[in-house]
Amino acid sequence: MKVSVAALAVLLIAICYQTSAAPVGSDPPTSCCFTYISRQLPFSFVADYYETNSQCPHAGVVFITRKGREVCANPENDWVQDYMNKLELN
């Protein structure tokens, strides 16, 4: 009986430790852009996009190509803004 109570106590402590290890509401960035594509992608290659997390060191737009590749682009470029607007309308 003492073994099972001890095991239960250790398990409970481990669970409590895991839940308190990360601050509440922390959302680590899943992908960040550290370099941008140097040329404009053909719009016909682009299937979707998402913006990088605000916790990333640099703002970025990640275009997902029709082949499933992810390409980082500078959100300050005019063509990037144009593609984002076109994709939002579809």
From Swiss-Prot:
Homodimer. Pfam families: IL8. It comes from Gallus gallus. Residues 1-21 form the signal peptide. GO terms for cellular component: extracellular space. GO terms for biological process: antimicrobial humoral immune response mediated by antimicrobial peptide; chemokine-mediated signaling pathway; eosinophil chemotaxis; inflammatory response; positive regulation of cell migration. Keywords: Chemotaxis, Cytokine, Disulfide bond, Secreted, Signal. Disulfide bonds join 32-56, 33-72. The keyword Secreted applies. Its main location: secreted. Belongs to the intercrine beta (chemokine CC) family. This is C-C motif chemokine 4 homolog. Monokine with inflammatory and chemokinetic properties. The keyword Amino-acid biosynthesis does not apply. It is found in: Secreted. GO terms for molecular function: CCR chemokine receptor binding; chemokine activity. It comes from the Eukaryota.
